[in-house]
């Protein structure tokens, strides 16, 4: 595996790969890689000839009181994990390489409406930071495909919208959620969960699973279901941020006759903010 720190060197390596007729897949990450990230890499490998992974802890998508400085930097372990699965390229730029004029002067990419709801409501500016850095990475790498995990469903939907609106020639591929044995979605932020909280940290997944059961049983009073699901999270000792039943494409509140819906939620533990989601196709119901 070759590691690059500079934009020009990445472009040269990928240009050579394309001259050899190879297709390129891209997996953007913030590092601290775990099995779910590696699953995305393997998924990309099954679809293209060459896979490049980026590791960049993007300050632009962290809020004023968020954990940018605490976010785990594990580049040596990350590099070893990627090499072990025969990843072709690792792009590991620093902030000066990505934002040479400083973040305040950086041109921003904003996806209206979708970025201000759900996680965007409690993390203002977060998705603006995501779409800005991802659009920049797409321009650097120019991949044929890019793989994003479904766990960050709102991010996935926003990236799809951005690619569609800006006519970026990349296919967005969704990677399934990888879960721990008890259903907790794998996340780099799981390392912030305290040992005391960990046995019940799957409560968000359990509440969304309960929500799914109610909907499959025919219940369509979505606001009442959302309130009940949040109550279940509170009863387990955690603080819900939101539980929302949404149209899978637009992220707008789902109508009772919507056939493709996604159940999204976020909750706070003492040390972490966790997100999860489940999607339903009600066409056969």
From Swiss-Prot:
Pathway field: Cofactor biosynthesis; (R)-pantothenate biosynthesis; (R)-pantothenate from (R)-pantoate and beta-alanine: step 1/1
GO molecular function, one term: pantoate-beta-alanine ligase activity
Cross-referenced SUPFAM superfamilies: Nucleotidylyl transferase
Binding site for (R)-pantoate: 61, 155
UniProt GO BP: pantothenate biosynthetic process
Keywords: ATP-binding, Cytoplasm, Ligase, Nucleotide-binding, Pantothenate biosynthesis
UniProt superkingdom: Bacteria
Catalytic activity entry: (R)-pantoate + beta-alanine + ATP = (R)-pantothenate + AMP + diphosphate + H(+)
Active site residues of this protein: 37
Binding site for beta-alanine: 61
Homology family: Belongs to the pantothenate synthetase family.
Note: The reaction proceeds by a bi uni uni bi ping pong mechanism.
Database matches in NCBIfam families: panC
Name of protein: Pantothenate synthetase
Taxonomic lineage of the native organism: Bacteria, Pseudomonadati, Pseudomonadota, Gammaproteobacteria, Cellvibrionales
Gene name, Swiss-Prot/TrEMBL: panC
